[in-house]
């Protein structure tokens, strides 16, 4: 869209665009949120982003100043890649679009990062010279110079409130935030697993259409829990049961969707539920982000940050002894950072170094570089871990998974629990109101809100989601892994074969499929 000398291209949704439009003078040529964003940027520059509620990635060319500005939403819901060229800058929502210029070399350090994290963290991409704009950042290009700045950083200051006051404010905020995410000219659905986050999302809407996915493996199927929640909430509910053949059919499609190696096995279930829901709706809400916002991960109430357990946990995950960690890691060995990294479950560094061929490994490589820039020394362990999750695995892992798998089916998925107003509010809540470390339980506030809204006993169900029984499938298909590892050795990526341990096996299978698609 054009306004004077400014040209805007934009991907996303601005939920409060009507309110912003009322504050801007116009003149108006349409009723779109794109035009509202363009007028806001023309009037206030990137400072105006503080007023925006939504998910977005955009580029605006300011012709008079001959300046290009890129921006990505606060939490990284929408992606944005860029590539600095000798005579300009190229950008796209998909990495593959930048490969048409020419195909750069694969970044060996990005492969190491992938095996450690399960994804390639921003600002890196799998290719040298192609970058991801980090969440909550802007990039300005002018006369060949690039400046990248963070425009949003939530406060971690705790505010004193009683539990009842906190619940009242939280409920009021959810009543505003969740319905706002249904803004659309088309029907909006809700993904409903057997868990509490998706049920919370559905409970603040009137008779929404809900969609659930189960598997032929009974031990991992969430259909019964989702069905009970849907009945209690009065939703219009639809279910799908996926078979192994559905998973295998999706297996070759996934690497092309992500453009980079991405090892979260839940991507396949997200892909299938999006494909299923798209038959009826083009927009869906999900409960993504509930674990980060309401404190649902076991690490939040564990003792991962204490001195007594750090080394035991790190060594149990295969991290090398302190004498082999390198000076930079030794400085953090008793702060909990290595233990936290190990708890996330990626491939341990010592195993990565043993596995990769010589050209792909680097002596003394700092596998914690991505986490280190967000680690807050001296904070309560819960505050540290939430802050780290918010800035790392949320955008690079969880939200990447949801965006790519849904957009592959032209389905727009919106995560209302990651509305920045809700995130900021929950970061201000006393940790004592969020987790019970003695009883090893999280999501205390969310449980209080949902107790009267769900069937008896539903909140005692084990943590769930649209999980896929990948481990069982891999064990039933040993030749698949064997052939994948053999191909990676032929490419000179691996130095040796591996055993059937799940995380390692799955990461390597995905890496092989990515090389087949792009390498």
Regions found by a protein language model. Name each.
Residues 47, 100-103, 129-134, 145, ...:
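Adenosyl-5′-phosphate
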Residues 18, 67-69, 78-79, 99, ...:
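Short catalytic/ligand-binding loop motif for oxyanion handling, primarily in non-cytosolic enzymes
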Residues 252-256, 278-279, 299-302, 473-475:
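Short low-complexity, flexible loop/linker segments enriched in glycine and/or proline
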Residues 77, 98-101, 118, 133-136, ...:
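Phosphate/oxyanion-binding loops and surfaces in catalytic or ligand/nucleic-acid-binding neighborhoods
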Residues 74, 85, 272-333, 376, ...:
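Active-site adenylate/phosphate-handling loop in enzymes that bind or generate adenylated species
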Residues 13-14, 63-65, 75, 96, ...:
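Short, glycine-/Ser/Thr-/acidic-enriched flexible segments
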Residues 1-259, 270, 274, 451-452, ...:
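Cysteine-centered catalytic environments shared across enzyme families
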Residues 261-265:
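Donor nucleotide-sugar recognition loop
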